[in-house]
Regions:
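Bacterial lipoprotein signal-peptidase II cleavage site
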Residues: 5, 20-51
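Extracytoplasmic small-molecule ligand-binding "clamshell" domains
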Residues: 52, 60-138, 285-286, 296, ...
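Ligand-binding clefts/hinges and TM-proximal coupling segments of bilobed small-molecule sensing domains
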Residues: 58-64, 68, 111-114, 188-224, ...
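Bilobed "Venus flytrap"/periplasmic-binding protein-like clamshell domains
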Residues: 74, 78-82, 93-106, 158-220, ...
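Periplasmic-binding protein-like
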Residues: 78, 156-164, 249-291, 308-309
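Short helices/loops that flank or line small-molecule/ion binding pockets
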Residues: 103-107, 114-117, 121-135, 148-150, ...
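Acidic, polar ligand-binding/catalytic clefts
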Residues: 113-175, 260-266, 279
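A ligand-binding cleft/hinge motif common to bilobed small-molecule-binding domains
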Residues: 138-148, 192-195, 231-268
Length: 309
């Protein structure tokens, strides 16, 4: 009996040690599995979009992305169909620039995107104030603007033209002489129109100084009325407050309804880029992504999707 009790005790102790060893191994494996899921959740999402996506260009050599979660704050237009448009019923944004913003957020490692409606007059101010991280809002790249903000390689190129009512009998730059033209505050349209009219010999260029040009004081051969945004200019054109509406053609297309037409000329190519704060670390990462998407045809696909070709 004594021998049996000793054998039973030995077997019991062996069982305890065996169970302890198994329990320790199981806990370590679970910890590894949890950590792997947390580290690779966003990577799996990116992989689902295509292993050849240039999002990898925004990753560091150790596989880490620019952002570790958080929200990418993007300034966009809300009334430019095809680029940035906010559905009045759902509040949802859509358009080529909205798609690019979502792609940037995913490739850079953000969890979410927050859209803020901007105008030509407010987009730079909001960027400077740190209220948004970048701007995708038909923002034309100019040498002057590049002194204030970083811009990516252009993802879209447009040209400026002029929209008028059929009843106006305006068909060319020459017909705009001594007329009043509606433009958006903070845009480059007025300056481009003056230069085009000077180049065409419609108005003299003696008093024109590109660096000193001011929309509200220019009256030499053509005058301008500034408005907060494009729908306001379209309304003013219909009401006869202005004789013409001048901006990029892709934007004017939204307002070219029956009874309206473009003048014969287009001028001043407009290159749209992603704008970021001057010297911001995100600037270089966005540049890599945009150039990658231009090279692999992704941007062309978006232009086709939104009928902007």
């Amino acid at each position: 009996m004594k021998l049996k009790r000793i054998l039973a005790l030995v077997l019991a102790l062996a069982l305890v040690f065996a169970l302890a060893a198994c329990g320790g191994d199981g806990k370590k494996d679970d910890t590894k599995a949890d950590a792997g899921t947390a580290d690779t959740g966003k990577t799996d999402d990116a992989a689902a979009a295509g292993s050849d996506a240039p999002a990898d260009d925004a990753a560091a050599s150790d596989g880490a992305k620019f952002a570790d979660g958080g929200t990418l704050r993007v300034g966009v237009k809300n009334a430019v169909e095809g680029f940035g448009y906010q559905d009045p019923l759902t509040g949802e944004y859509e358009g080529m620039e909205i798609d690019i913003a979502n792609m940037l957020a995913d490739a850079l490692g953000y969890d979410d995107v927050e859209f803020t409606t901007v105008t030509a007059a407010t987009r730079g101010e909001l960027l400077d104030a740190g209220d948004i991280d970048c701007v995708l809002a038909t923002f034309t790249i100019t040498e002057e603007r590049k002194q204030s903000w970083d811009f990516s390689t252009p993802y879209y190129t447009d040209a400026i033209t002029v929209l008028v009512e059929d009843a106006s009998n305006i068909t060319s730059l020459a017909d705009l002489k001594d007329k009043t033209v509606g433009v958006s505050s903070g845009s480059t349209s007025a300056k481009a129109l003056v230069e085009a009219m000077i180049d065409a010999g419609v108005i003299p260029g003696d008093n024109y100084d590109a660096e000193a040009f001011q929309i509200d004081t220019w009256t030499d051969g053509v005058k301008f009325q500034q408005y907060a945004d494009y729908p306001d200019i379209s309304t003013a054109l219909a009401a006869g407050e202005v004789d013409a509406f001048c901006v990029d053609k892709s934007i004017l297309a939204i307002y070219k309804t029956d009874g309206r037409h473009y003048i014969d000329e287009s001028f001043s190519p407009q290159e749209y880029g992603v704008a970021t704060k001057k010297g911001a670390p995100i600037s270089a990462e966005i540049e890599k992504l945009i150039t990658g998407w231009l090279d692999d045809g992704t941007i062309d696909g978006l232009i086709g999707k939104w009928n902007l070709g």
